[in-house]
Amino acid sequence: LTSAVLTTTPSEPSAKPGELRSLGDFARGSGLQSLVIGISKDPTAKVTVLLVSPVSGRPVLAVKVPTTDVAARAVEAEERALLAIRQVAPRKVVDVIPRVVDAVEFEGRRATVVTAMPGIPMATSYIRRRHTATQALVAADFNAVETWLTELQSGTAGRSARVDMDGGVAARLRERFPDDVRFDADLDQLAEINDRLGRNETPRTAVHGDMWFGNVLLAGTQITGVVDWEASTTLGEPIRDLVRFALMYALFLDRRTRPQRRVAGHPGLRAVRWGAGVEFALDGVGWFPDLFRQFLERGLVRLGAPAASWRDAAVAGIAEVAALTDDHDFARRHFELFRRLCRAGHA
């Protein structure tokens, strides 16, 4: 039954929930066991149901189940994105991207069935004791993502265009923070940053859109899966993925550290306030700031932009998170971080 399920033709993206099999019927027909994980409560709340082999105990399929109308739109967006990315990405990239197997109905909404990717989430190793304090382990994480992004971007590169890190960010920020009295000055600084970046060109490539370490799966130091493609595009600004990974990696360096204490493995970094790890990465001294900057510099040069624009790209990436994240508090914290970094860098 499992092999039959894996070789079925996916239901048309236009099929309405009432035209689909129920999740329960699909799960029973697959011969697999169900395991519910990843329940969230935000506006795009989804439940992930893993269908596990009763023989090997390994996940075979994953079902993205929306619990709100907003989440339903996000699930459908990811389904379309996964189908689209497989049309343009090279084999090495496609091999680590979930494949849409089918769509099912759950409580009147469309849920997407995809292949489960092997490996351990990078987030699991990230939170292990001493992992982010150990230069070799952190470098291996960055190297794995650099290798994969190189394959994705070189394999999907199209026409070149001016670097565009805005993509509606400024407009979204204005909607999100309408009562902020300092907002116009902040937007002026963001415009200056984007103007400097826009003097350069990069190829339009496939973009994941949420390239943080929680969406990367590993076997050793090799990437075996990249998940959560709902924010992706087949033709976008590749610098977005580059800076998103580096920024999110830096953001949580002090997660185990008590307030005001030194962060283990990173001389010069203290857990003094939210975002201290990012400030350290951009303006600090040490092996992690060096690794962070070199990762961005190499990526920018590979894409045809000057290495010297790494800081502008990173700060623009912080503004992007403030604009696009679903969590308003997370957005506000990023916006305040953007302000501090602009002051520090005299943007």
Report residues per predicted region:
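ATP-binding glycine-rich loop module of kinase domains
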Residues: 45-78, 134
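Short beta-strand micro-motifs within the conserved protein kinase catalytic domain, predominantly
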Residues: 97-110
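Active-site acidic catalytic loop and adjacent metal/ATP-binding pocket
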Residues: 38, 42, 46-52, 56-58, ...
